[in-house]
Curated annotation (Swiss-Prot):
Similarity comment: family membership: Belongs to the class I-like SAM-binding methyltransferase superfamily. rRNA adenine N(6)-methyltransferase family. RsmA subfamily.
Stated name of the protein: Ribosomal RNA small subunit methyltransferase A
Main location group: cytoplasm
Keyword Cytoplasm attributed: yes
Gene3D superfamilies reported for this sequence: Ribosomal RNA adenine dimethylase-like, domain 2, Vaccinia Virus protein VP39
Record-level Gene Ontology MF annotations: 16S rRNA (adenine(1518)-N(6)/adenine(1519)-N(6))-dimethyltransferase activity; RNA binding
Binding site for S-adenosyl-L-methionine: N31, L33, G58, E79, D104, N129
Gene name linked to the record: rsmA
Species of provenance: Leuconostoc mesenteroides subsp. mesenteroides (strain ATCC 8293 / DSM 20343 / BCRC 11652 / CCM 1803 / JCM 6124 / NCDO 523 / NBRC 100496 / NCIMB 8023 / NCTC 12954 / NRRL B-1118 / 37Y)
């Protein structure tokens, strides 16, 4: 019976694509995972149990969703492509613990949806095979949301995975690195070759596991802290001082406030943002806040 064959089986994947006249859509960054070993390793990395509520982002034709449904209590899958939603209604028919929501996860009040679907105070695990072009904004939104999550296991481009734990002063170090450092610990779970997909992407992939961390220095407004960080990286080759002038203004009064803030935080204005660690950015934010400059 065809229905007993895993969706990720290469033959069945191709049959589904043929049946619905599907092609991977570049605008949605679609590549279909056809390596069952990788899928099993993703579920294992997420430590999915029969008591777990799972959020999946970008289910595609349901290859990963199927494996999650076999292990989890309930799976809530967000799919932006209406054509894929139609396919999922068929491929996931055997699983009554899966609900597919046709929406862009970046435009959803995830905390509200989780409360409605899983109940108040539910802890969730988030699993995703993310389109590479949108990996960073989705990760940042998830980490900065107020949802309770036990872990996040995400497939991403290997180059992006390397940025998560990039060292201070390196080319890969930036806003994403600092966001991860503030909220989570990132570990490389699986390396995934391009041959694991249909069609094969032009880059290798990696599965990364994020586990929540308590910040070493808690600030009262995380959004403003990362506003400072983002502004500091607005032009990587410019000095911190020049980026701050562009962000806060160039009038004499503002320059004086910036000078006081930098001195208070003990930061050289000529330094580039990539040379500052999270603690230094935190101190800079607090100093700018004291000068009423945080936006």
């Amino acid at each position: 019976m065809a229905q007993t064959i895993d969706i990720a089986n290469p033959t069945r994947t191709q049959a589904i694509l043929n049946e619905y006249g599907l092609r991977a859509k570049k605008k949605f960054g679609q590549n279909f995972l056809t390596d069952l070993n990788v899928l099993h390793n993703i579920v294992e990395a997420a430590e999915i149990t029969a008591e777990d509520y799972v959020i999946e982002i970008g289910p595609g034709i349901g290859a990963l969703t199927e494996q999650l449904a076999r292990s989890a209590k309930k799976v809530l899958a967000f799919e932006i492509d209406s054509q894929m939603v139609e396919v999922l209604a068929d491929t996931l028919k055997p699983y009554d613990n899966v609900k597919v929501i046709e929406n862009d996860v970046l435009k959803v009040d995830l905390a509200k949806v989780i409360s409605e679907e899983f109940g108040d105070n539910a802890h969730v695990k988030i699993v995703a095979n993310l389109p590479y072009y949108i990996t960073t904004p989705i990760l940042i939104q998830l980490l900065r949301s107020n949802i309770n999550w036990d872990n996040i296991v995400v497939m991403m481009q290997r180059e992006v995975a390397d940025r998560l734990n990039a060292a201070v002063g390196t080319k890969s170090y930036g806003v994403l690195t600092l966001t991860i450092q503030y909220f989570a610990q990132a570990t490389l779970a699986i390396k995934v070759p391009a041959s694991s997909f249909n069609p094969s992407p032009n880059v290798d992939s990696a599965v990364v596991k994020l586990t929540p961390l308590k910040p070493t220095t808690v600030v009262e407004n995380v959004g403003k802290l990362f506003g400072v960080i983002k502004g500091s990286f607005s032009h990587r080759r410019k000095s911190l001082w020049n980026n701050m002038l562009q962000t806060y203004g160039k009038d004499a009064g503002t320059k004086e406030q910036l000078t006081v803030a930098l001195k208070s935080a003990q930061i050289d204005p000529a330094i580039r943002a990539e040379r500052l660690n999270l603690e230094q950015f935190t101190q800079l934010y607090l100093a700018l806040r004291d000068q009423n400059l945080t936006q």
